Structures are given as C-alpha cells and as structure tokens.
Amino acid sequence: MKILVDADSCPVKDIVFQVAREYSVKVVVVKDLSHEIDSNYAEVITADQGRDSVDLIIVNNTDKGDIVITQDYGLASLALTKQAIVLHPNGWKFTEENIDGLLLNRHINQQIRQRNGRHTKTPKRKSKDDNNFKNLLKEIIVQMKSS
C-alpha cells in the first residue's frame, strides 16, 4: 500500500505526510512543473506541464489497494478502475456508487459555464474538512494494515 497525491492544488499534503509517517506508509506526490513541493518523507515526481500529465503518472503508478488523494473527478474515476481507495481532500471517499453522479454533475456545470451561466460554487474550505480528511485517512490505513 502506498499513498499517491495529486499535488496540484492539494490542501492536505502536510496532513498526508504526517499521517503517512505515523503509520510508515510510502507517499508518492505527483506535481507539474509549475508547483514546487519539498518533502523529506515523500517521493516527489514532476510531470511535464500539460493537460492530464499528472493524472496519467498517478494512474500508471496506482496498484490495487493504494490510496489516491485527489479533487479531480476524472482521475478519481480512473483510480477506482484500478481498485484504489480514492479520497477527496474534504474527507470523503469516491466510490463506484457516487462517481457517475459526480461526473454527471461536473458535465452539467461545464455546459452551464459554456453558456455563460452560473452554477453552484464550491464552498470554502473549513478546518472541519481537514479533521474529516485526517480521520478518514487514518481509519483507512488502519483497516488496510489489519487486513
């Protein structure tokens, strides 16, 4: 088991590093050239700038039972097909049951934006989101290590 982090605009990298170190879990952070990330714990992979370059590296390095951290619904969908556990930084899991609805909602919002319309904006991040994420990540690691 390892944790793969989609580092582009990931607000929970420090939490991931802390929890992974606590439970001795390998972390792979994938970023593009426009982001600078230093970690004395995680392996940092830099992808070329380009649409989906980070996503492709993550998917190609994901194995069954790995944990993938992302806000990207498309990447989440691909990681689920590799039988990974996929977490959103707000502390909830992407699942086979919710991914289709999330992708459909994303598509509808894109269509509204293309017509210069408005759509519901994502609420601002709260400290509760960090706590939810940290607790969920710990819970999943404990489950995976005990099975």
UniProtKB/Swiss-Prot annotation:
It comes from the Bacteria. Transmembrane segments: none annotated. Belongs to the UPF0178 family. HAMAP family: UPF0178 (MF_00489). This is UPF0178 protein Nther_1836. The lineage of its organism: Bacteria, Bacillati, Bacillota, Clostridia, Natranaerobiales.
